[in-house]
Amino acid sequence: MWRPRWDPGILKAEALALLPCGLGMAFSQSHVMASRRHQHGRLIIEVDEYSSNPTQAFTFYNINQGRFQPPHVQMVDPVPHDAPKPPGYTRFVCVSDTHSRTDPIQMPYGDVLIHAGDFTELGLPSEVKKFNEWLGSLPYEYKIVIAGNHELTFDQEFMADLIKQDFYYFPSVSKLKPENYENVQSLLTNCIYLQDSEVTVRGFRIYGSPWQPWFYGWGFNLPRGQALLEKWNLIPEGVDILITHGPPLGFLDWVPKKMQRVGCVELLNTVQRRVQPRLHVFGHIHEGYGVMADGTTTYVNASVCTVNYQPVNPPIVIDLPTPRNS
């Protein structure tokens, strides 16, 4: 159902697993040590030596391993919106970073909607209510949503620190009373909201997490390295679909203006070495919109808004075989 840019044929979802897998390539000793330790039979990911400099990490792993080059990694064209869904498949419609700009979006047919965060500008209750109304107008059987760094009110620790400040960093948010944001998640009545939690729909185990590397002091920001790794360690093995707000290193995380890779190294190692989901959906980096695959996981940056906050990127459609036990 996907047409890879290096192959004139049509590539179905299950065929991605037959591509040369990144796990089969040579890994440096430091990388292997970062993921080889076991505890009670579980593979333990450790902080990568290049954690604090993702651009350097990308360069190192590319030069020494070709880790982000064909045939280990391929760009993939998503399913056309008007393509018929194969029998026995579930159609996922993936969006992210809509930033309260949902009116122009043409939503395609599908079974499950995934929104990877930044559905508001600041997480104001009025914005959340408007987003929830939009969700209610959509016909999908399931709608699964996580927060992003713009959903400030969803990060309770962030809000507790914000209202203590003497200056108004986010004036419209910092003036909110606790009773107006402490249960802001409850405003999302038309979806399944995930925050370091999982749900099973149609037989797919789906896990969602809002955290990303520090980004100018917004919501759900954490320092690179151990702090983020502790969040990724919460992701259970056996997850079919992973939703995070930010990207892993090397996958749709390039920021041309800064000439930098900004993805999380620990998230990459967690995804490729331990969790190995079939689908990883994220956003955050508006410039990275698109689809890639590494032979095990399909990576989707579903950012609807461009870097100039224009909602012109269409939703990305992914078809996956429905588990037989669903």
From Swiss-Prot:
User: Does the entry feature the keyword Protein biosynthesis, yes or no?
Assistant: no
Drop me one GO molecular function for this one.
hydrolase activity
UniProt EC number: 3.1.-.-
Q: Which UniProt keywords apply?
A: Hydrolase
Record carries keyword Cytoplasm? no
Record-annotated disulphide pairs: none
- Which enzyme class? hydrolase
Short name of one Pfam family? Metallophos
The protein's role, per its UniProt record: May have metallophosphoesterase activity (in vitro).
The entry sums up its family as follows: Belongs to the UPF0046 family.
What's the protein called, per UniProt? Metallophosphoesterase domain-containing protein 1
